[in-house]
Amino acid sequence: MKMLVAALALLGLALWPTVGAARDATYQARADQLLSILSAPGGEDTYFSTLFLDAVPVAQWRALAADLRKQYGKPLARGAVQVESPTTGVVEIRYERATIGFTLVVAPQAPNRVVGLQLVGTRRTDDDMDRVLAGIAALPGRTALAIAQLGDAGPVWLHEQHADTLMATGSSFKLYILAELARAVAAGERRWSDVIPLSHKSFSGRLLTTPDGAPMTLHSLALAMIAESDNSAADTLLLALGRTRVDAMVATSGHARPDATLPLLTTAEAFALKMPAHADLARNYAAATPDQRRAIITANAAQLTAGAVDIGTVADIPTAIDSIEWFATPRDMVRLLDWLRRNGGDALPIMAVNPGIAPADGKRWRYLGYKGGSEPGVIAMNFLVQARDGRWFAIAASWNDSAARVDEPRFVALMTRALNLLAQ
C-alpha cells in the first residue's frame, strides 16, 4: 500500500496540468469512468493520457488497482465528486470495505483524458471508534487522547484515553502564542497588521534564512508559525507579545496544571537545554519551580540561543522529552481549542491553512483547524472541526516514546480515521 500511495503521489506532483476551460459534464464523465478502470483491467489506453501511461505503464497500473481490490474488496459505486476547477476535483469510490478518495485531473483539451491521479484518503467501511482507540493504545510508549463536542457550556467529553495525563506536545504550544495574539488583537492592544522585526531565529523553517530584523506583520508571523510550524516565527512572537502574557494564556485557556509547563520555552531555549553539554542545567531546570526556571533562563540567556545550539546532538533520537518540553494533557488542548473557537477571530482562518490530514478527508468538514507538533519520540495532533450540520468538535492526542522515534504516518492514519468517524 505504501508503494501505491507513493506512486500515485508522484503522479499528482509530476503530471499536474495547466488548468483550462472544460465542461463540467466532461469531468463528471471521467469521474464516473474511474469506477470501471479500478474494477477490472481494460480501457486504460483511452482513459489515461500518454503522459500518464509513460510514467505508469498499463501493467503497473493494473497491479496498483489489483492491490486496492485485494485490500478493500471490489469497487461498488462512485461516491461524492468535489469539483475544484473544470479539470480538477476529488472523486470518492466506494469499495466493499472502504471508501477511497482520489484527486482526479483531466486534460482541458479533447478527448480530455486523465493526466493526474492521486490517492488522498481512505475510510474503512467496517471501522469504529473502539478500533481506533485500540490502535492508539497498542502503540509503543505512552499515548493519550480526548475527543469532545463543543458547545456553550464547554466541552462534552465523547471519547477519552488517559486524557488527564501530561504529555510532551512539541510545537502544539504555538497555539498558546496564537491565542494570546488573538486576545491582544480583540482587546485593541495589537493589530494583525502591526509590523515587528524578525528578531529571534531558531531551527528550523523558512524564516531561518530570512535576513535578521526583516520587518514582518504579526499576521505573517502567525501564519508561518501555525501553517509551517516555523520556529523563528514562534520565538519572535512569543518574546514580542511577552512571555508573561503568553504564560498567562496557558491558565486562561484552561490548562489544569500550568506549573508543569511554565514558563513556555522558546524553541531555541528548548533545543539548547536538550543538548548533552547542558545536561546539568537541564536537570536543574526540570526540578525547579516556574519562578526558578525563569531565573535560570535569564541567568543563562547567552547559552540558550540558536547560535549556541549543536542541532545534530538533539535531532536524531528522543532527547529529554519527559523533562524539557511543552507539557499538556489532551483535555488541556481541547479546552485551548475551545477557547480559540470562541475567541480566536481571525486566528481561525490561520489554523485552517494546513489541515494536517489528506485533503479529501479534510473536506468532510465545514471547517478544519489544525496544529500539531513532532520531534524524535513525540507526535501530537490537535484538531478543531465544524461538521456540515454546524456542530463543533475537538480532538487532541499525543504519542510519546522516550526509547525510539515514533511512526508518524501510523499516528496520522489513526487520527484521520477518528476524524472520518466523527464526521459521519
Language-model-detected regions and their locations in the chain:
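Beta-lactamase-like hydrolase cores
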Residues: 120-165
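Structured C-terminal helix/loop/strand segments within mature extracytoplasmic catalytic/sensor domains
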Residues: 121-139, 311-424
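Short, glycine/proline-biased beta-turn/loop segments that scaffold the active-site neighborhood
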Residues: 187-214
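Active-site-adjacent helix/loop patches that line small-molecule binding or acyl-intermediate pockets
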Residues: 213-305, 331
